[in-house]
Amino acid sequence: MNNALKNTLGLFNLNRIDRDLFSWTGESVGFQRIFGGQIMAQCLVAGYETVEKARMVHSFHSYFLRPGDFDQDIIFEVDRIRDGKSFTTRRVTAIQNGEAIFS
């Protein structure tokens, strides 16, 4: 596996802090802001870590609230809204400096 692929996959390695709390420590790669697709994917990973592995993503809605900064840790807070027989619902908020940057 080449370094670019390893670095890209490393973006999705979140650290579990608590049952519904994850973090990611970034490092500057020369961009001013974090790419929105990265935050979306990381939120998806955080939410997926809180559901049964047999569950698949059915729907994903998101809001970009503020620009993300590579030099700041991101906290992913998962809200377990519903665990039903057919569907599981999660809300994931990405937070930097105490403010939501993505939901």
Question: Where are the regions a protein language model picked out?
Answer:
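Terminal targeting signals and extreme-terminal segments of soluble enzymes
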Residues: 1-103
